[in-house]
């Protein structure tokens, strides 16, 4: 089985939990992290050896990403979901 490569959108409480779980799973890799709070996103990216995305679209559209974890505020979910669907990514 190949490694599942993730983009993580949002590094609040639940985003941090998912970042850690992705990191601890040997069959997954955290490739990109994005959050409107750049400093918080940078901390998580550095902690888990991921790249910091400047925009959600940058993370979602990268060809190295297989799936997108949407951990942002609920009102933003639909926009990110549509971006990920358009990019043909698995969505969590």
Where are these regions (language model features)?
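N-terminal Rossmann-like dinucleotide-binding module
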Residues: 1-48
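Beta-loop-alpha module in the N-terminal Rossmann-like domain of NAD(P)-dependent dehydrogenases
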Residues: 18, 50-92
């Amino acid at each position: 089985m190949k490694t599942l490569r993730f983009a993580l959108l949002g590094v609040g409480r639940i985003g941090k939990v998912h970042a850690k779980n992705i990191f601890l799973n040997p069959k997954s890799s955290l490739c990109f992290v994005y959050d409107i709070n750049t400093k918080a996103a940078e901390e998580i990216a550095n902690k888990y050896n991921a790249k910091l995305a400047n925009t959600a679209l940058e993370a979602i559209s990268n060809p190295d990403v297989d799936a997108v974890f949407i951990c942002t505020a609920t009102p933003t979910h639909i926009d990110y979901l549509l971006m990920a669907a358009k990019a043909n990514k698995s969505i969590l």
